[in-house]
Amino acid sequence: MKTQTTHAAEQHAAKQRWLNAHEEGYHKAMGNRQVQMIAIGGAIGTGLFLGAGARLQMAGPALALVYLICGIFSFFILRALGELVLHRPSSGSFVSYAREFLGEKAAYVAGWMYFINWAMTGIVDITAVALYMHYWGTFGDVPQWVFALGALTIVGTMNMIGVKWFAEMEFWFALIKVLAIVIFLVVGTIFLGTGQPLEGNATGFHLITDNGGFFPHGLLPALVLIQGVVFAFASIELVGTAAGECKDPQKMVPKAINSVIWRIGLFYVGSVVLLVLLLPWNAYQAGQSPFVTFFSKLGVPYIGSIMNIVVLTAALSSLNSGLYCTGRILRSMSMGGSAPKFMAKMSRQHVPYAGILATLVVYVVGVFLNYLVPSRVFEIVLNFASLGIIASWAFIMVCQMRLRQAIKEGKAADVSFKLPGAPFTSWLTLLFLLSVLVLMAFDYPNGTYTIASLPLIAILLVAGWFGVRRRVAEIHRTAPVTADSTESVVLKEEAAT
């Protein structure tokens, strides 16, 4: 029995060495300061700065509770990802872990679903940039697609720079986002604490009871809203991808992940609670940042414009992060055969430029959407982005569970940074993600149509697999086979034939 366990551990170690070879070519240039801010900035994006306006209209004060629920499960997902990162840091993130624990088919599905997430998220971000620019009346007559194309050009160029420059830019982008929220929290708390009226109206808890209570539209709209709020946390897993280019991921990643949970509570829940205590929830509008709405009503010259510049930066930051992620995820998939061979190419600056360019091509579709249906593009694309992130998070949880199993069986070394309450919290998180899919079906028409598109996505994934499986088989013919990996055996047999 001991001999079998030792043999299984040796096979698993051999596969890890093969997977680690996929990381060659990256420049380990990210420091602790940058990783910390990337983790924080990943949790603060367009979903809060722009999406919160429409969400307050739909759920009222209950939005704070929705953010809290989603935030707790986001923390579980981050801790699960942290386990995987300490097991084996990888720029391929959970796609590489899916390849290790679930096989190449799972890595193929995980990778392309994550690509769907970031492809859709990028379209949301360039749409957000265009909407923010229309805040200024001077640009009111400029078509939305022009700003979308401009944002795409700027960020696409930035992503071709080396990772050190990306990390530094993302640090400052994230810092601006954090400072914006902190300034709002300080100014809003002063107004609330001193009892100063805002636009002639008193602030305080009465604004909740005077405007329909905590659930002004009932419980069901608040529950359905969970599927939209999930998008607000869609970048938290960025820290997993960044771990592959960290100087010391074993120390940096746990510290960064543990800092996220209380910041989610402060920035998301605290901000929404403060927003509804300062103004009636129905004073906020879809299409305009609620923070811009608040500062504009202070009567201070240019404060609304300054805040609008901040949230514009947030959208560009999210777009920048998306291109960073997809370039590396597509390269990881290409190394395993699940994506075209050219996507594995690296530039002299150690940047996976081919994957980034492929993503930019998809983002151009977003520019056309801004031209064709500018008023609906944000909500249409938001649902598809949520679908992609739900699938990605589910793969993270399943891989974490398989890692625990491998550790228990002696195939992998134990890790010091673990998901609290696992496996209960692992199963609970998977149940939560499944419930989000169910809730999406009730969000008619966009959510309903998104769920209805699942069979089409499944057909496309199956068709795509038949297109790549020969290359996958060729690559896996020389890859180590773990004791429990029947898929690799099948792939090798296919390659032999």
Task: Give the predicted meaning of each segment.
Residues 343-353, 393-444:
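C-terminal membrane-solvent junction of multi-pass transporters and transport-like membrane proteins
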Residues 380, 384-392, 419-497:
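A generic transmembrane alpha-helix motif of multi-pass inner-membrane proteins
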Residues 176-210, 273-279, 393-410, 467-472:
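Hydrophobic alpha-helical segments and their helix-loop junctions in multi-pass secondary transporters
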Residues 144-202, 234, 257-261, 382-395, ...:
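Membrane-interface loop-to-helix entry segments
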Residues 1-53, 57-62, 75, 79, ...:
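Membrane-interface "cap" regions at the ends of multi-pass membrane proteins
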Residues 30-49, 151-154, 208-269, 274-275, ...:
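Hydrophobic, membrane-embedded alpha-helices of multi-pass small-molecule transporters
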Residues 96-98, 103, 135-139, 208-212, ...:
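TM-loop-TM module centered on a large, flexible mid-protein loop between adjacent transmembrane helices
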Residues 26-30, 50-147, 157, 260-263, ...:
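Extracellular loop-to-transmembrane helix junctions
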